[in-house]
Amino acid sequence: MPILYDVQRIRDGKSFTTRTVNAIQNGEYIFNMSVSFKISEEGLEHQFEMPDVPSPEELKSDREFREEMKDKIPKAMLEGFLRDKPIEIRNVENLNPFDNEKGEPFKNMWIKASGKLPDNHLIHQGVLAYASDMGLRGTSQRPHGFSFGAYEKLQVASLDHAMWFHREFRADEWLLYSLDSPSASNANGFNRGNIFTQDGKLVASAVQEGLIRVKDK
């Protein structure tokens, strides 16, 4: 079913441009977004250091990880779990995504597009925006013993998602996605992610609040 994108011009300044985007399908609003664009310029710079983690070349491939975990995955989710994805992931912690053991609200994983992308930075930003949703909400579930796949026990949803692009990058080269969840309260989990190139450059950040409501037994 086609989606209509309605773009509204909010502001055009010397350095900044702002737009709002509404996605409409079958007469219903299904998505809205506020977008801010800025010209490039020289200025003050600093950044967080990249976490000290193994390189993606030292870790199991996504396919190797899925094969290793397939006997531990619920049958109802196995087909989707084994299917090839548009984003390749190499988990640093090598966690079973369906293991309900409690853990710290941190996660690191290497991500990249599965195929070669054109030399257009907007495409790379779009691909990374898509990938930035992966694993983010589930970080706030870990301290409470709910795995990334605990859908039978939790009512979950992404409530909002914000992203900032700091520096240029390629989404078809390995990027470290370093996730943490500073807080969960009121049945909502607050999650953050910083994205680094292999040489340690911080290129993007994401923030997401997600519903993590425990279902009645």
Pin down the residues of each PLM region.
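Terminal targeting signals and extreme-terminal segments of soluble enzymes
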Residues: 1-217
